[in-house]
């Protein structure tokens, strides 16, 4: 029996885990090495800093990410509460002012009487549990060594890439139109249309641009969900036109037709002064980014306030290491959470932290940790990452394909997802502690 939970890592997962444990009366030590020691991608000491995008993805139940958010809200998620307060326009997606979001999460956790935030790097795993390790995709080398020595497991490496951000005032709006695909949502996106000649010139510049070199000790394994735009382009001349530059559902008012290709810009802060290039995560050198991306209509004079960056992402072989409760096999007092487990995405990481916070509290009190029901978004995601049949193991976003199928076939995808969501929420809302009941 214990009244304390130790959490290593103050990202989305660690922050949510700390909140869940503290609201259940536990004394929480939350260890975060920033700002004294920054990662290659972080730039502040804020807890829950967003580094890849300001979007928390779809908020509608038509998308499984929306279902996961709905379950988290029911469970009293801090990340969902703060995201709602910091929301910026993004159509049917949930996007936030990233600085306001992280600063609010930090202020709330630092002010909580049951939480002590310690700004130091942890280089060894404490042997007095329960302990939650939520050090994220940029786990420090010292902690990687500690984990490897402790678990004996092999680690896999792949790359995440962050998209550039430009100032709104530097854009040429005579070459840009507002709108969302198929008219869904408000006119929350800025669209930069390209004709065939413009696209081909942009494509050639992109695939021949100079990239930042990767570290020799890291094999180049790229996760599809955050692939650098130049890597995607190298697959073929039309790959981008069927990916982030797809024009479907967008009509250029200047021509009355769909463009040959389009680059979308999404608002990045509440003031509307910054926009990020949607789907344009990149590892190009900074000078090359200016040269290549200024070929996009509307961006010829763009001011880049942040260039795209490339960083290593670390995750464990969860099917070998973890139980669905997020406990390490053979070490029931040790929990892992967040992207370190192989979940991919902001919301997935926070959801993972939510479960870890609940279960670490239960373990501390001598209670049996819980497994979220498999027909819920939380349960389906954790089942996937801990299923030993997944070989080789790859990171995964939440999606409806992870949930158990319906007993009867429904051909219409939207209707099928609606039924899956209704079933999941009914089960989640009666699941006891996870549901907030």
UniProtKB/Swiss-Prot annotation:
InterPro entries: FAD/NAD-bd_sf, MnmG-rel, MnmG_N, TrmFO. Its cofactor is FAD. GO terms for cellular component: cytosol. Its EC number is 2.1.1.74. It catalyses: uridine(54) in tRNA + (6R)-5,10-methylene-5,6,7,8-tetrahydrofolate + NADH + H(+) = 5-methyluridine(54) in tRNA + (6S)-5,6,7,8-tetrahydrofolate + NAD(+); uridine(54) in tRNA + (6R)-5,10-methylene-5,6,7,8-tetrahydrofolate + NADPH + H(+) = 5-methyluridine(54) in tRNA + (6S)-5,6,7,8-tetrahydrofolate + NADP(+). It comes from the Bacteria. FAD binds at residues 9-14. SUPFAM superfamilies: FAD/NAD(P)-binding domain. It is found in: Cytoplasm. Belongs to the MnmG family. TrmFO subfamily. HAMAP family: TrmFO (MF_01037). This is Methylenetetrahydrofolate--tRNA-(uracil-5-)-methyltransferase TrmFO.
